[in-house]
Amino acid sequence: MMQHLFEKLFRAESMSQEESQQLFAAIVRGELEPSQLAAVLISMKVRGETPAEIAGAAQALLADAQHFPRPDYLFADIVGTGGDGTNSINISTASAFVAASCGVKVAKHGNRSVSSRSGSSDLLAAFGIRLDMSAEQSRLALDDLGVCFLFAPQYHTGFRHAMPVRQQLKTRTLFNVLGPLINPARPPLALIGVYSPELVLPIAQTLKVLGYQRAAVVHGGGMDEVAIHAPTQVAELNNGSIESYQLTPEDFGLNRYPLAALQGGMPEENRDILARLLQGKGETAHAAAVAANVALLLKLYGQENLRHNAQQALEMIHSGQAFDRVTALAARG
């Protein structure tokens, strides 16, 4: 079976969703030789992965994931692929705490850094938040605090089989876009940032195949976030239909700031930057960046007015309430 799929890929043909699921199920079980895995990933990359192939791979990884007790209530993920090369502060991580303060639930799936000096997990560890919280403890945090973090390596042990090949290839592959699609809590809503504008629509189409209820995929001026220095490309999935549009900082009622204003640092520096921000004492550019991302996330919950949402987020940031959730989550260690 595998040989048939290899030959198909080497003829630059696309796999069906089912074929991709079979192939990636074998990959996470460690059944491919490193040379076979490298050949598969590169042949898919050169041709361009289809939404059906990405969805099949995501389904294989979700089927292999450790169990998380999925809640009945609405909850979301806010996550980027990373790898945008901008080394910005952890906007999506800060946004998760602010969104929870605004009254919505966020189960954030994260990992250590891809391109910035500090990924979401690096930052959380710097705040004293345990990365190895059990699924049950994380679910309780989601219930009580409105926010929890699910550390990818804890739930996706099969990823390790691909790691040596990925490190040797030193190029982006399908695995770089899979992270945001394989949240073990299986959220019905998601705001997903991607490192390239070419990925915005294909990833939205993938989310449709995966059965998300409502989601937005974004790329803003080189960043895997909603941008405040440039227009943001959006593909929004809403009950099976996808709408593509552009957003500017002005659509949120926010000022523009240069990308340099969002420069991040090492985990400890980022921790200090975000601690000040979430206590209401941060830079105005940082607050605006988080407010824009929270505003779009709130839209997925049916709060359609982006200006109102951004204002609500800014009020939460200035009140310092978001930081209370950071300390409360750290206290659960």
UniProtKB/Swiss-Prot annotation:
One of its GO terms (biological process) is L-tryptophan biosynthetic process. Mg(2+) 1 binds at S92, E225. Transmembrane segments: none annotated. Binds 2 magnesium ions per monomer. Pathway: Amino-acid biosynthesis; L-tryptophan biosynthesis; L-tryptophan from chorismate: step 2/5. Its cofactor is Mg(2+). It comes from the Bacteria. Mg(2+) 2 binds at D224, E225. 5-phospho-alpha-D-ribose 1-diphosphate binds at residues 80, 83-84, 88, 90-93, 108-116, 120. GO terms for cellular component: cytosol. Anthranilate 2 binds at R166. Its EC number is 2.4.2.18. One of its GO terms (molecular function) is anthranilate phosphoribosyltransferase activity. It catalyses: N-(5-phospho-beta-D-ribosyl)anthranilate + diphosphate = 5-phospho-alpha-D-ribose 1-diphosphate + anthranilate. Belongs to the anthranilate phosphoribosyltransferase family. Homodimer. Catalyzes the transfer of the phosphoribosyl group of 5-phosphorylribose-1-pyrophosphate (PRPP) to anthranilate to yield N-(5'-phosphoribosyl)-anthranilate (PRA). This is Anthranilate phosphoribosyltransferase. It comes from Yersinia pestis. The gene is trpD.
